[in-house]
Amino acid sequence: MPADHFLKRQAMSDFIICYDITDPRRLGRLYRYLIKRAVPLQYSVFLFRGDDRQLERCIQDAIELIDEKQDDLRVYPLPGRGLKARIGRPTLPEGIQWSGLPAKW
């Protein structure tokens, strides 16, 4: 059995996608791409929910938008039952509740 077999997820999982892009044009392109597929949490930090196939497609398309020699794109899986909390200023106005990620993949 391949070593990466245990890393494959078939169910929906949460991932943090973050980047450091050196060129403003590439930065804008990547931001516009990710904003349609994930939820922005902070500048250059997004929450992506999907299975392995969706994540791979998202990242492969994102790689096409960056310069791999100058830019940095990272993906971190979040544990399914891990603590997810926000401390500090609220992201949304009071009374507004977040119901999920964008429907369009």
UniProtKB/Swiss-Prot annotation:
Coiled coil: none
Cofactor(s) essential for the protein: Mg(2+)
EC number(s) per entry: 3.1.-.-
Gene Ontology biological process terms, A to Z: defense response to virus; maintenance of CRISPR repeat elements
Disulfide bonds listed in the record: none
UniProt function note: CRISPR (clustered regularly interspaced short palindromic repeat), is an adaptive immune system that provides protection against mobile genetic elements (viruses, transposable elements and conjugative plasmids). CRISPR clusters contain sequences complementary to antecedent mobile elements and target invading nucleic acids. CRISPR clusters are transcribed and processed into CRISPR RNA (crRNA). Functions as a ssRNA-specific endoribonuclease. Involved in the integration of spacer DNA into the CRISPR cassette.
HAMAP family for the chain: Cas2
NCBIfam families named in the record: cas2
Protein name, per record: CRISPR-associated endoribonuclease Cas2 1
Species: Nitrosomonas europaea (strain ATCC 19718 / CIP 103999 / KCTC 2705 / NBRC 14298)
Encoding gene per record: cas21
